Amino acid sequence: MEVPPAVFINSCPNCGLDVSSERLAKGSVCDKCLDEELEFNGVYDLAKKLHERGTLKNLKNVLELHREFSKVERIFKEALGYPPLGPQRSWVLRVLRGESFAIIAPPGLGKTTFGLLMSLYFSSNKKRTIGIFPTRTIVAQSVSRLQDLSTKLELAPRIIYYHAGLTQGEKKEVLSALESNDFDIFLTTSRFVIDNLDTLKRVDYNFLFVDDVDTALKSSKSAKSILQLSGFSEDDIEKTRELLRQARKDETAFRKIAELRQGKLEGKVVVFSSATITKGNPVMSALMGFRPG
């Protein structure tokens, strides 16, 4: 039985006006946005056509997302010899959408390399990254890897790093650079975050990458420091803890947590990396709005 045509009120994905079921079935938009009767295989092709016609509105973000993904894809190809593969594609898209999330994946899937390459993408857009690693050895390895990747990409980001092995003079230089936001990428340990939280909270950054978050979660002080670095106050943390206690009886608890979260992460993307999170931090997960990726 053939379904008769229908008109859906305020349902055009591009302008919000009325659109026919026939056009929607073809992956298209209303006749005000596109007078031609065309069929589209994907939303990117549709957005590109609307851009050509000068009628692109609500779908503009689709075109921008595709352009930025192409930039990241080029970075991966030039640095590694291949584009983002498998779950890396999903991780890239989520970062480009401005999502904060936790990567839970076994070793060998390129979680750390993904974080380093995304930091280079952000620096190419004049945006700062903070990378947190469990030990000074891994910080040193990551700095070396980042420098190699930068050379392959012919980029020259201002990379600074801090760990216990630096001289007093080197430590002072790093702290001065942090105070003045005179860097593109900063790599350090979770211990540094605890000891220098006030300094880091004044840093204007866009991307926070926490490698091996399991180690950070072993210390409540470390987990709390990372939440505060992300933009949450001690009051936010305590209020969330109390709301989680009430969640079984109060159906509005999670909505209240979501409202608390709104605006706190604005302009920032926070990504946690883990091989297997066996014991999570419910306050951190709730405040960050994490869902595994």
What do these predicted ranges mean?
Residues 1-293:
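N-terminal helicase ATP-binding lobe
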